[in-house]
Regions:
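Conserved helicase NTPase motor core
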Residues: 16, 42-46, 141, 145-248, ...
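Short glycine-/polar-rich loops that comprise or flank the Walker A/P-loop
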Residues: 11-14, 220-224, 230-232, 252-257, ...
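Helicase P-loop NTPase motor core
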Residues: 254-256, 262-357, 383-384
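Extended, charge-rich low-complexity interaction segments
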Residues: 47-58, 290-300, 388-413
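Conserved ATP-driven helicase/translocase motor core recognized via long
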Residues: 58-62, 76-153, 158
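ATPase/helicase motor core of nucleic-acid motors
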Residues: 22, 252, 327-415
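Conserved P-loop NTPase-based nucleic-acid remodeling module centered on helicase motor cores
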Residues: 2-103, 247
Length: 415
């Protein structure tokens, strides 16, 4: 807002700048929609809560990708059931994939055994009474595959319900809860503040729920909503973003769409590669794709596809290419773009072995490091001395307790 005030001038104190999660958090706390002592937990703390129920080492789970992914599925499933209970439209479900085909088959088998109809209410009822259905996996004549499906589902339901109950009893919210609770409140309360002017950046990154919240925030009479997005970036479906989001907005904003057609940075030969991919793989209209005003011609080996037989050889070949480019012109810089932080770490190690100086931009967000989380926890308790999660982080951070689970139990006993 300081930058906006310098450019535009005037009073900008009423201007809200932030992502959808930030707006939801600000709304819930400042409008007293949740208890004053509520606290927001991150993924690490959510895993710690479930690990405590499962009597597993929370740090061991965090270090093991497959186990961590299983915990995430439990968390996602809890949100799935919440949305089912609150009758959210299917297109707004955050994690429909958490209710797998195997889960559906398991539910159908339980319903068949119990002689009840298979529907949403059956799913919700079994979820809330999962332990009462464990014997369904031992029904005589039931094949082993279906029995395993039932066991996996019921344990997932049980721990998801435990996670939900723990959050409710301790006034905790995870990041998805911020969206879900804000959506529910705005959907039913006409007195909530609506906004006449809204600007949404990186709209291709929004999932259906986030877009629905923005719609609920908008006044009905003559609103001005500006969406800024990039169709070529709408490929990150693992984040919940989809090309369909932009397609929906294009239909909604028909006649009021402006395309930025000129790319001033990339040479034409490189931009053509990305445009061809966008047209043929993402099915984006060629007329909507940018053109370059940099018509420099490609030199030999400017565009190359290098085949590697193994991951290790790929890392070595990438390192060799980067080193050759550096030796050809030490004034130029080379960027190596990878798909994950672990890939960056491995390539960095390979470059270190051959003495190739480089700067690695990857790793965990600074604000998720233990030291920064500990610092922010101190500030949090100054603002709200009843913030139990902040106290838990402090007690774990100063090594008063070896785990978040023990620190949480101690805080609970102090209440």
């Amino acid at each position: 807002t300081n930058r906006i005030q310098k450019v535009v001038g005037g009073d900008s104190t009423e201007l809200m700048v932030g992502n959808v999660h930030r707006f939801c958090s600000k709304f819930l706390f400042e409008q007293d929609k949740i208890p004053a002592d509520s606290a927001i937990i991150d993924d690490e703390e959510a895993v710690s809560i479930i690990a405590d129920y499962r009597n597993e080492d929370e740090e061991g789970v965090t270090r093991d990708f497959n186990r961590y992914k299983g915990y995430q599925t439990i968390i996602f499933f809890q949100h799935f059931i919440y949305q089912m209970e609150h009758q959210h439209p299917w297109k707004y479900y955050l994690h429909p994939e958490s209710f797998t085909d195997d889960d559906r088959e398991a539910i159908k088998q339980i319903c068949k055994s119990q002689k009840r109809e298979y529907n949403e209410q059956a799913v919700i009822d079994i979820y809330h009474h999962a332990q009462q259905y464990v014997d369904e996996a031992n029904v005589p004549g039931l094949d082993a595959k279906t029995a395993d499906r039932i066991r996996v589902l019921l344990w997932k339901m049980y721990y998801a319900a435990c996670y939900a109950q723990y959050k409710e009893e301790n006034h905790l919210l995870d990041f998805e809860d911020l969206l879900l609770k804000t959506y529910d409140i705005y959907s039913t309360d006409d007195t909530c503040k609506r906004y006449k002017w809204i600007q949404v950046d990186e709209v291709q990154d929004l999932n259906g729920m986030q877009l629905a919240i923005i719609d609920l925030l908008t006044v009905k009479d003559n609103p001005m909503v500006m969406y800024l997005g990039d169709e070529q970036q709408a490929i990150f479906s693992f984040m919940g973003a989809k090309v369909e989001t932009l397609t929906l907005l294009k239909m909604r904003c028909k006649g009021n769409i402006h395309h930025l057609q000129r790319n001033h940075r990339s040479p034409k030969y490189l931009l053509d590669v990305f445009n061809d991919y966008a047209e043929k793989q993402l099915k984006i209209d060629r007329e909507l794709l940018p053109a370059s005003d940099n018509d420099v011609k490609a030199k030999p080996e400017n565009l190359r596809i290098i085949h590697s037989s193994t991951i290790d050889s790929e890392r070595q070949e990438v390192t060799d290419v980067a080193r050759n480019l550096y030796e050809q012109n030490k004034e130029e810089r080379t960027a190596v773009i990878v798909s994950s932080n672990s890939d960056a770490d491995h390539i960095s190690e390979t470059m270190d072995k051959v003495g190739l100086t480089h700067f690695k931009v990857s790793g965990r967000d600074l604000f998720y490091t233990p030291d920064v989380k500990l610092l922010l926890s101190h500030l949090s308790v100054l603002a709200n001395e009843h913030n139990s999660i902040a106290w838990t982080r402090i007690m774990k951070g100063v090594r008063a307790f070896p785990s978040h689970a023990l620190a949480r139990r101690f805080n609970w006993k102090l209440k």
